[in-house]
Amino acid sequence: MLGVSATTIRTDLNQMDKAKLLTKTHGGAGYRDASSGNKELTGRAYFFHERALENQHEKDLIAGEAIKLVENHMCIFLDASSTAYTLGMKLRGFTELTVITNGINLALSLKDIPGVTVILTGGIVTSASSSIEGLLGEDLLKKIHTDIAFVSARGFSLENGLTDFSIYEADLKRMCIKSSAKTVALIDHTKFDTTSISSYASVDDIHLLITDNGLSRNTKEIYEKAGIDLLIAGE
């Protein structure tokens, strides 16, 4: 964890907003830069379709390994990340599968697959990330058990685990992980050794981490020595 409460983070964001160091957005903050526009500190302001174009090859490799873990009759959680969306697009062909997600684009893409039942989490709709945030659906999440939670993150480190820029989305993912038998992190090599605002899972919460073959040998050895079960896609 970052060692500070959500209240402290919100207070600091308010103060920086007043000082014109950034612009507050729902669940996060944006960097004030007249030359480049108002982009959030970790890129969260990018629209979903823009994020989907980044590291496409790596995401496809990761999703190709993740799909091997999915079986009929499972109930799985997929977050609103573009990597989870790539995984979701590989679910055609399943005849009996339940998918819980906070990703609007993913839900719309899966709704016409006959063998897939889609459940959207309750919450507030965000425009840029095309996701649903918040815990209005907390009671629902407490009642549903998932076999695997597939999650991505803005950053991943040994000290802070999986981190996200949105406090609200981190809260939702934290709840989903608690109700899942297994957590599988889908993290491309660019996310390693970086940290965003809100931690939602420690390294001990992760049963398997799938990354791409762009991860350096040194970084791979460091994380494996720390007990992380790494699956390198594309090796």
Regions found by a protein language model. Give the residues of each.
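HTH-adjacent hinge/linker in prokaryotic transcriptional regulators
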Residues: 1-3, 7-8, 13-77, 89, ...
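Residues at secondary-structure transition points
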Residues: 53-57, 61, 82, 94, ...
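Structural motif
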Residues: 79, 100-102, 121, 186
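Conserved phosphate- and dinucleotide-binding cores of soluble alpha/beta proteins
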Residues: 3-5, 18, 24, 107-235
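Short, flexible active-site-adjacent loop segments at beta-strand->alpha-helix junctions, enriched
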Residues: 35, 82, 103, 124, ...
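Short glycine/serine/threonine-rich phosphate/pyrophosphate-binding segments
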Residues: 84-87, 194-195
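A residue-level structural signature of the nucleotidyltransferase/glycosyltransferase Rossmann-like core
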Residues: 98-99, 148
